[in-house]
Every structure is written in structure tokens, then in C-alpha cells.
UniProtKB/Swiss-Prot annotation:
The active site is at 8 (proton acceptor), 128 (proton donor). It comes from Gemmatimonas aurantiaca (strain DSM 14586 / JCM 11422 / NBRC 100505 / T-27). Keywords: Amino-acid biosynthesis, Cytoplasm, Histidine biosynthesis, Isomerase. NCBIfam families: 1-(5-phosphoribosyl)-5-[(5-phosphoribosylamino)methylideneamino]imidazole-4-carboxamide isomerase. One of its GO terms (cellular component) is cytoplasm. Its EC number is 5.3.1.16. This is 1-(5-phosphoribosyl)-5-[(5-phosphoribosylamino)methylideneamino] imidazole-4-carboxamide isomerase. SUPFAM superfamilies: Ribulose-phoshate binding barrel. Pfam families: His_biosynth.
Amino acid sequence: MIAIPAVDLRGGQCVQLVGGDYEQEQVRLADPLSVARDWSRTGFTRMHIVDLDAATGRGQNHELIRDLLRDSMVPVQVGGGVRDESRIERLIDDGAEWVVVGTRAVEDEDWREEMANRFPGRLIVAADVRERRVVTRGWAETSRLDVIDFVESLRTLPLAGVLVTAVHLEGLMQGTDLPLMEDVAEASAWPVYASGGVTSLEDMRALEHRGLAGAVLGMALYTGVLDARRLAEEYGA
């Protein structure tokens, strides 16, 4: 079980949102490079970078992500608006260990299969979830797709993992959706990483007990509610 700090990018800065709502931005830090370095120095051995602007189609942070990847002291997974093969290739060329694909991987089964086979072991499929339904396009659209059905459809693909975000709990620091995460872990053939509401070491232990491979953490780390050094000592590697 590994703890993975999130570096969410918006307008060239590091931010944290509440409940997946772009109007509720609770954290904004001007220097994402410094933020990422601090997480590495604290003892975390993996990083999660998301381009929120690209996810919503309102811009992109490609040059900043390239700089973050080249500067990083630890393996990095990158997502947000990754919807074509050339972007996957560019991210890997720039140094991403894994690429997180969401909206197009949900909506286009043929593309999902083609990309997974073209980049075996390098793709993490994101299932952003609200009320057990998969949401897409930067959490703006809710599909009719049940998350368990979706995760089961990924079984034959050579993935690096599945990232499940409980969007309804994102940034609220009220704990994560344990029943959801447990059900996804049971349904998945691949390592499952939880995101959304993970706030305490108790949350981490509960996820570990339910078979999760790791968790992406944001608000609890940025606000100091969760002791970053202690978390890194227990779940940094």
C-alpha cells in the first residue's frame, strides 16, 4: 500500500478543489515545482500529477508538466485530458512512468483497448465516480455506466492499474467511500488506487485491509490535517 501525493494543476499553479467543483478552490500554491520537490523530500516515492485545465478542455499545462517530470526525483503518473495517442507518447517521452486515461477510455472501448495494448503496463484507467456512476470530462458529465461493470470490462487489458476517485468526497476530508473502494478492488484484475476523501492513517489502514494498492491524497496533506512525514514513513514506499 502506497500513499501518493497529488499535484493538481490549474492556470500554472497547484490547487485543490472541493467535491470536484471548480468554483470551490480551497488551496492555491504558486510554485508546483517546489511543491513536488517538498513531497519527495518528505519521503514519498511516487507522485500523481493532474492537468485540471486539460481535463475540462479550458487550456493546458503541458510545459509545466514536462518541467515537473524532468525535475522529479520519484516516478510520476500523469493524467488530465489525455485523449490521444500522441499525448500518451509525449508524456512517456518526457518521463512519465504511467499515464492516467479517463474520459476517452470510458467512452471509446476500441481506443481503450488499442492504447492499452500499445503501451502495456504504462496506462492507469481512471474511474471517477459519483453515486456509483462513472463521470467524465473533468467531473462535469455523469454517464449511465456503473463503475463495477466498467472495471470488470478492463480485465483483459494489460493495464498498470485502476484509479477510482470518489468525486462526491473529493476535498471534503470526511473519509473515503470504503464500500465503493472494496467493491472495485474485488472486481478488478489490476491494482486499484483510491482517491477522494482520504484523510487519516485510519483511512489508509482501512483501504489496505480491503485490498487497495494505494491512495492518492490531496487536501488532507495540503492543509496539514494529515501529518505528511508520518504518512510517508508508514506508506511512502
